[in-house]
Amino acid sequence: MLLGKAHSVLFWVDMILIIILLWMVINQVIIFVRSRRAAKIVDNEEFKKVMHHAQIIDVREEDSFKAGHILGARNIPFSQFKMYIGGIRKDMPVYLYEQGKALALRCAIMLKKEGFDKIFVLKGGYNKWDGKKKKN
């Protein structure tokens, strides 16, 4: 009798873990789909072509930005992005980057919700950037 209860408890623990795992996977898929709708991923060449006529925003934290950033970029860290979103112009394209692209895509979703429509994210982020950089 005791062994049957143990199996029953383990079954429900397994079911709960499976549900949590499924929820996490579904959540990531939703974020991926929303981010693809919010921004276009661009490579270095496309980024370089338009960077002089756009707002370039580095969403890394300030210490990373100070260590080096794309020439002409300004820093709005992801942790403070919602607070400073009002300082971004809607009439100009917005080019976002970071180390990779996950946080930049999340910022793109925020911008899209605020009515921005020209949003781009640098493929590979700062790590893959081969253009001009500014080091402090």
Where are these predicted regions, by residue range?
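Short glycine/proline-enriched coil/turn segments at helix->beta-strand junctions
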Residues: 51-55, 71, 90-92, 116
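Flexible, polar/low-complexity N-terminal or interdomain linker segments that lie immediately upstream
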Residues: 1-67
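Short loop/edge segments at beta-strand edges and connector loops
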Residues: 43, 77-78, 123
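Conserved beta-strand scaffold positions in the cores of enzyme catalytic domains, especially
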Residues: 56, 73-75, 119-121
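Catalytic cysteine-centered active loop of the rhodanese-like fold, especially the PTP/DSP P-loop
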Residues: 82, 88-130
